[in-house]
Regions:
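ATP-dependent carboxylate/acyl-activation modules
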Residues: 1-197, 202-316, 328, 337, ...
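Glycine-rich, proline-tolerant flexible connector loops at the mouths of alpha/beta enzymes
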Residues: 319-323
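Short internal beta-strands
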Residues: 342-351
């Protein structure tokens, strides 16, 4: 789950992380009053969308007068902001963050993530801040330092020394860095984040460390522990089909391919996607209906898959353990009749009540292609489209 920059900074502030003063605007009302509350000389007007590259796209601008603030908010609010992460269609800006300006002396990079290699939360830091970290990793990887944190000890003095050294924090900056590293780690772990990125982390001319930007992703599987964070979801930034799937308890992720997938079990779903690619097609989605799906839930899953206009065929791959194949078959037929499936449909069933499930499909008189195994199913769906 992603949130906006201003929401991320509000959370970090609760963990005593230094962030610039700022206020959010949800409309063009009260612009001057909001600006006066934030600063009295320099402001930064920031578009709030779930995408990077806002500055290069014209969504982050500096104002040096209240009149400039008003004009910039009027310009940015409602604009279709195009960045390297939005695609050519861009995203409409419906929220604008007004923040006090900072006198920047140096820009650094810092992030925390769950590192699969070390099986720990790791800091990724670099003296090359304010730029695309992927470019730094490709061109000058020696400028990036990774420090993995032992969950049994948390951030130790040795970790702080390593991080401070990597970022060249000396003198008065080192104790500030020490507090910052511990606060960011606490925020990451206690909030069940999957990514926390500060780019740039700046040193001001006054020799203060400030998080000038903040990107936060939460582990969606842990949101039941944080109902207050669920309220931060901006529906306008979410995929409509993914929101609908979530409401029905389905795990759905939209992809860019042409073969819709309906599978039970995350591992089987990923294997299905791999074999579809092996045969030269591309999966249009990841969709796991789980082990206790009902006929009604399978019908809703079909509706969600077919809401994607790029879908040219559907592959159903079910291994019936907890889920019965006859229930899936009834759901497939119900969905095919209700939503008028007009694309090729290949079904592979195996497991509990498989013969009954196959019989239900055969007697339905629908144009459903049966498959004996996953390889056969993937081959048939790619040939059918």
């Amino acid at each position: 789950m992603n949130i906006h920059e201003y929401q991320a900074k509000a959370i970090l502030k609760n963990f005593n992380v230094p962030v610039p003063k700022g206020e959010i605007l949800l409309s063009k009302d009260n612009i001057l009053e909001t600006a006066k509350n934030v600063s009295d000389d320099v402001w930064v007007v920031k578009a709030q969308i779930h995408a990077g590259g806002r500055g290069k796209g014209g969504g982050v601008k500096i104002a040096k007068s209240l009149e400039e603030v008003e004009n910039l908010v009027d310009e940015i609010m409602g604009m279709q902001l195009i960045t390297h992460q939005t695609g050519p269609e861009g995203k409409k800006v419906s929220r604008v963050y007004i923040e006090e300006g900072s006198n920047i002396s140096e820009e650094l990079y810092l992030s925390l993530l769950v590192d699969r290699q070390s099986s720990q939360v790791s800091f990724i830091v670099s003296t090359e801040g304010g730029v695309n970290i992927e470019e730094v990793a490709e061109e000058t990887p020696e400028k990036i330092t990774t420090v993995s944190i032992d969950p049994n000890t948390g951030v130790t003095d040795d970790d702080i020394d390593n991080l401070s050294s990597a970022l060249n924090l000396e003198g008065d900056l080192k104790p500030q860095g020490s507090d910052l590293f511990r606060s960011l780690y606490a925020a990451f772990v206690e909030s069940d984040m999957s990514l926390l990125e500060i780019n740039p982390l700046v040193i001001t001319a006054e020799n203060n460390i400030i998080c000038l930007d903040a990107k936060v992703n939460f582990d969606s599987n842990a949101l039941f522990r944080h109902p207050e964070y669920q309220e931060l979801i901006d529906p306008s930034e979410e995929d409509e089909a993914e929101l609908k799937a979530s409401a029905f308890g389905l795990s759905y992720i939209k992809l860019d391919g042409n073969i819709g997938c309906l599978v039970n079990g995350a591992g089987l779903a990923m294997a299905t996607m791999d074999i579809i690619k092996l045969y030269g097609a591309e999966p249009a989605n990841f969709l796991d209906v789980g082990g206790a799906a009902t006929k009604e839930l399978v019908t809703e899953a079909f509706k969600i898959i077919l809401s994607d206009k790029n879908v040219e065929g559907i592959l159903v791959n079910i291994f019936g353990g907890i889920m019965r194949c006859d229930v899936v078959a009834e759901g497939i037929i119900s969905a095919a009749n209700e939503v008028n499936v007009s694309v090729p449909l290949v079904v592979r069933l195996e497991g509990t009540n498989v013969e009954l499930g196959k019989k239900i499909i055969e007697e339905s008189d629908l144009s459903i292609i049966s498959a004996s195994d996953l390889d056969d199913a993937s081959k048939k769906i790619t040939e059918a489209i």
